[in-house]
């Protein structure tokens, strides 16, 4: 079994991105499955170019995308990605789309195919604050989630995919009064999420 797990580079003036810091701390193998780690750029063009090539090349059994949601107090598992790019903040290339589709002619939305509620339940049982989120926003995180699910759909693949938002790390919250979480807790949470995806795949006969 093979799982592609991505995090993002820093953006918005931050020196780190807790999503990538947590992802790169994951083991290379979890319960016999290969964990492929990749850092994505915080650019609308980058995720739409890189993710399709990466998914088709690696053909993973699951794709778990992660990103920073500064201000959220818990790990949030996204339910849906929408075909919209709309941002008040430029991406790392200075691009600021307004009411543009991620892909012209693609569906309005895709639901995550990882077990969203089961992941949240497992995280909470491990005493890690977690919740289901019904919006991944309209910035690069949503674009990445939509791109992954659209790529899998048009390629006829059976790969499971979803997105997990993580809070600021404690380091990032030193100078701002915002909710934060220890990087080790975030990393542990991602490992639990991966194991729940394994359970889901096993039940379906992967």
UniProtKB/Swiss-Prot annotation:
Enzyme Commission number, as recorded: 3.4.19.3
GO molecular function terms attached to this record: pyroglutamyl-peptidase activity
Catalytic activity, reaction form: Release of an N-terminal pyroglutamyl group from a polypeptide, the second amino acid generally not being Pro
One cellular component term from this protein's GO annotations in UniProt: cytosol
Subcellular location: Cytoplasm
Top EC category: hydrolase
Active site: 78, 141, 165
BP terms from Gene Ontology: proteolysis
Function according to Swiss-Prot or TrEMBL: Removes 5-oxoproline from various penultimate amino acid residues except L-proline.
Complex formation: Homotetramer.
Family: Belongs to the peptidase C15 family.
Protein name: Pyrrolidone-carboxylate peptidase
UniProt lineage: Archaea, Methanobacteriati, Methanobacteriota, Thermococci, Thermococcales
